[in-house]
């Protein structure tokens, strides 16, 4: 068991998992669509109490990883979100476990592959069989309803190599927008000396996380999928009770999910395509807007397709704002060139980017904009509420991957957090 902060800290060994019977601990894929029901690996064959092994959560909240290594030397790692028994800091951070589940295709389905259910015959060659790759007119979300997705599945997309350090480039397709990227956020907090409590997003929905026990909430990287309960709890906290929100990511709060039980969710994608350009045609800005309202009413920004899958630095537009104090930046200066995000290299504005819309709150200030193609740069915005609440949003999935290595990004983020902490 390891704790992932600014450094990887070995907590303790867990021991060997083995049994007398030949291949008794070999896992098998159950029959049926376990993307809906869960893989239930522990439901068979652990009848005796002596067969069971438990791990007690560490007392200190944080992002933990379990390291597993077989006799062959093959290595695998997976995250464990450890929330506090009681609030212990002024800052709460959410790990985006709902988003992890939406993108997890273990078992053959995710919210992006066979989102509307399995086809009658298994896919053999995705590029030749899935409309995602064969039909340029294909709309990602075109059905009125979508089968559930279970949290009870392994998450290979959150794997972090054994020898990776927090300042190493984030390689691969998935790692740069899920737990490995979020590690850069909590690691940066520790490097800068900020205490924090880490929670799973689902704990905001369940009520385990009480926002009123904290001054600041941080969400980062790619918190795309939220329940309506989560959204309105956060909005009420910011607009009515003076809560401070730091949105250090992109394409956030973009689509509603519903929890059927503790382990299962349904995504409310709608049947209008899902993209900003599709939804604009019917006067909507996001899938969340289809069911409720635009997330820009809270965040100040919402995601659009321009700039997608590119990376670029930001340009300062209002350098005399307190956000830029101590950076030495002037209007027109470029910052955020250094970034660990290797899927869309080029800078802290990237991967998927958010911009202001007509739904942004009155008084929302545009402080900087990314230099991505097609005017697709992420927009850094700030707004405050009558209750004393404040929101700082960076509009970019790539942003947290710049925190450990870009001085200006680090200083700007610290300026905001220091002000929000008072």
What are the functions of these language-model segments?
Residues 16-19, 24-46, 51-60, 174-260, ...:
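Helical hinge/lid and interdomain linker segments adjacent to catalytic or ligand-binding clefts
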Residues 56, 284-386:
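Catalytic beta-strand/loop cores that center a nucleophilic Ser/Cys/Thr
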Residues 2-40, 72-211:
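Aromatic-Pro/Gly-enriched surface loop or interdomain linker
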Residues 54-58, 80-85, 384:
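Extracellular and analogous surface-interaction loops
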Residues 4, 13-16, 33, 44-49, ...:
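Intrinsic-disorder/low-complexity accessory segments
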Residues 62-69:
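Short, aromatic- and glycine-rich surface loops/edge beta-strands on solvent-exposed regions
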Residues 224, 228-329:
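A glycine-rich, often tryptophan-bearing local segment used as a flexible ligand/cofactor-contacting loop or short
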Residues 192, 206-230, 235, 248, ...:
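Catalytic-domain carbohydrate-binding cleft regions of carbohydrate-active enzymes
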